[in-house]
Protein backbone atom coordinates (compact mmCIF):
# COMPACT_ATOMS: atom_id res chain seq x y z
CA UNK A 1 0.00 0.00 0.00
CA UNK A 2 0.84 3.66 -0.10
CA UNK A 3 3.12 4.84 2.71
CA UNK A 4 1.59 8.08 4.00
CA UNK A 5 4.34 9.15 6.39
CA UNK A 6 5.71 12.51 5.27
CA UNK A 7 3.31 12.90 2.34
CA UNK A 8 1.27 16.02 1.60
CA UNK A 9 -2.41 15.08 1.45
CA UNK A 10 -5.12 17.49 0.32
CA UNK A 11 -8.72 16.61 1.08
CA UNK A 12 -11.25 18.52 -0.98
CA UNK A 13 -14.42 18.02 1.02
CA UNK A 14 -16.43 19.43 3.88
CA UNK A 15 -18.01 16.52 5.63
CA UNK A 16 -18.42 15.61 9.25
CA UNK A 17 -18.87 11.97 8.20
CA UNK A 18 -15.97 11.52 5.76
CA UNK A 19 -13.70 14.55 5.89
CA UNK A 20 -12.83 15.03 9.54
CA UNK A 21 -12.41 11.36 10.49
CA UNK A 22 -10.33 10.67 7.37
CA UNK A 23 -8.14 13.73 8.02
CA UNK A 24 -7.41 12.54 11.56
CA UNK A 25 -6.66 8.99 10.38
CA UNK A 26 -4.27 10.32 7.73
CA UNK A 27 -2.51 12.53 10.29
CA UNK A 28 -2.16 9.53 12.60
CA UNK A 29 -0.30 7.79 9.75
CA UNK A 30 2.15 10.70 9.54
CA UNK A 31 0.70 12.62 6.60
CA UNK A 32 0.49 16.41 6.50
CA UNK A 33 -3.18 17.09 5.76
CA UNK A 34 -4.79 20.19 4.28
CA UNK A 35 -8.59 20.26 4.15
CA UNK A 36 -10.18 22.42 1.46
CA UNK A 37 -13.91 23.15 1.43
CA UNK A 38 -16.44 25.34 -0.36
CA UNK A 39 -14.98 28.51 1.20
CA UNK A 40 -11.35 27.71 0.32
CA UNK A 41 -9.81 30.09 -2.19
CA UNK A 42 -7.63 28.64 -4.94
CA UNK A 43 -8.28 24.96 -4.26
CA UNK A 44 -6.03 24.09 -7.21
CA UNK A 45 -3.12 25.91 -5.56
CA UNK A 46 -3.35 23.47 -2.65
CA UNK A 47 -4.04 20.34 -4.69
CA UNK A 48 -1.17 20.94 -7.15
CA UNK A 49 1.37 20.52 -4.34
CA UNK A 50 -0.20 17.35 -2.91
CA UNK A 51 1.18 13.84 -3.17
CA UNK A 52 -2.33 12.49 -2.49
CA UNK A 53 -5.65 14.19 -3.22
CA UNK A 54 -8.98 12.97 -1.81
CA UNK A 55 -12.04 14.47 -3.53
CA UNK A 56 -15.61 14.33 -2.16
CA UNK A 57 -17.54 17.44 -3.18
CA UNK A 58 -20.63 16.13 -4.98
CA UNK A 59 -19.87 17.96 -8.23
CA UNK A 60 -19.37 15.80 -11.34
CA UNK A 61 -15.85 16.08 -12.77
CA UNK A 62 -15.01 18.99 -10.44
CA UNK A 63 -11.35 17.95 -10.15
CA UNK A 64 -9.57 18.41 -13.47
CA UNK A 65 -6.08 17.98 -14.89
CA UNK A 66 -5.08 21.54 -13.98
CA UNK A 67 -5.55 20.66 -10.30
CA UNK A 68 -3.18 17.69 -9.95
CA UNK A 69 0.57 17.39 -9.45
CA UNK A 70 2.21 14.96 -11.90
CA UNK A 71 2.60 11.58 -10.22
CA UNK A 72 0.07 12.23 -7.44
CA UNK A 73 -2.41 9.64 -6.21
CA UNK A 74 -6.06 10.72 -6.58
CA UNK A 75 -8.88 9.16 -4.56
CA UNK A 76 -12.34 9.96 -5.92
CA UNK A 77 -15.06 9.46 -3.32
CA UNK A 78 -17.76 11.28 -5.31
CA UNK A 79 -20.84 9.54 -6.68
CA UNK A 80 -22.90 11.59 -9.13
CA UNK A 81 -25.53 10.86 -11.74
CA UNK A 82 -24.88 12.42 -15.14
CA UNK A 83 -27.60 12.46 -17.76
CA UNK A 84 -26.41 11.60 -21.25
CA UNK A 85 -27.82 13.18 -24.45
CA UNK A 86 -29.80 9.99 -25.16
CA UNK A 87 -31.58 10.33 -21.80
CA UNK A 88 -29.69 7.53 -20.08
CA UNK A 89 -27.91 8.14 -16.80
CA UNK A 90 -24.38 7.12 -15.88
CA UNK A 91 -22.49 7.29 -12.61
CA UNK A 92 -19.45 9.58 -12.53
CA UNK A 93 -17.17 10.79 -9.80
CA UNK A 94 -15.97 14.20 -8.71
CA UNK A 95 -12.75 13.68 -10.70
CA UNK A 96 -12.49 14.02 -14.49
CA UNK A 97 -10.86 10.59 -14.62
CA UNK A 98 -10.16 10.50 -18.37
CA UNK A 99 -8.13 13.71 -18.14
CA UNK A 100 -6.55 13.29 -14.69
CA UNK A 101 -5.35 9.70 -15.28
CA UNK A 102 -2.89 11.07 -17.85
CA UNK A 103 -1.14 13.07 -15.10
CA UNK A 104 -1.73 11.16 -11.85
CA UNK A 105 0.23 8.00 -11.09
CA UNK A 106 -2.76 6.34 -9.43
CA UNK A 107 -6.50 7.05 -9.48
CA UNK A 108 -9.61 5.31 -8.17
CA UNK A 109 -12.35 4.75 -10.75
CA UNK A 110 -16.02 5.63 -10.26
CA UNK A 111 -17.91 3.39 -10.14
CA UNK A 112 -15.88 0.49 -8.82
CA UNK A 113 -13.19 2.22 -6.75
CA UNK A 114 -13.91 3.34 -3.21
CA UNK A 115 -17.45 1.91 -3.04
CA UNK A 116 -16.60 -1.81 -3.10
CA UNK A 117 -13.81 -1.26 -0.55
CA UNK A 118 -16.28 0.55 1.74
CA UNK A 119 -18.78 -2.32 1.47
CA UNK A 120 -16.07 -4.87 2.24
CA UNK A 121 -14.90 -2.98 5.32
CA UNK A 122 -18.48 -2.55 6.55
CA UNK A 123 -19.08 -6.30 6.18
CA UNK A 124 -15.86 -7.07 8.07
CA UNK A 125 -16.77 -4.67 10.88
CA UNK A 126 -20.31 -6.07 11.12
CA UNK A 127 -18.87 -9.59 11.41
CA UNK A 128 -16.42 -8.50 14.12
CA UNK A 129 -19.21 -6.73 16.04
CA UNK A 130 -21.44 -9.81 15.82
CA UNK A 131 -18.63 -12.06 17.09
CA UNK A 132 -17.98 -9.71 20.01
CA UNK A 133 -21.68 -9.74 20.93
CA UNK A 134 -21.62 -13.55 20.99
CA UNK A 135 -18.44 -13.58 23.12
CA UNK A 136 -20.01 -11.10 25.56
CA UNK A 137 -23.08 -13.31 25.92
CA UNK A 138 -25.43 -10.78 24.33
CA UNK A 139 -26.41 -13.19 21.54
CA UNK A 140 -26.71 -16.95 21.26
CA UNK A 141 -24.20 -18.53 18.88
What is each residue range found by the language model?
Residues 1-73, 77, 82, 88-90, ...:
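Glycine-rich phosphate/diphosphate-binding loop of Rossmann-like nucleotide-binding domains
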Residues 6, 64, 135-141:
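Flexible, glycine/charged-enriched surface loops at secondary-structure junctions
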Residues 70, 75-138:
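Rossmann-fold NAD(P)-binding glycine/threonine-rich loop
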Amino acid sequence: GLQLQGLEVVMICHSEIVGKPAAFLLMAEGATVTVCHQMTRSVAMHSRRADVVVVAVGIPKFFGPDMVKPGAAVIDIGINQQELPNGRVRIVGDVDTDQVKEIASWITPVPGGVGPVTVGILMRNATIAHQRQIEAGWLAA
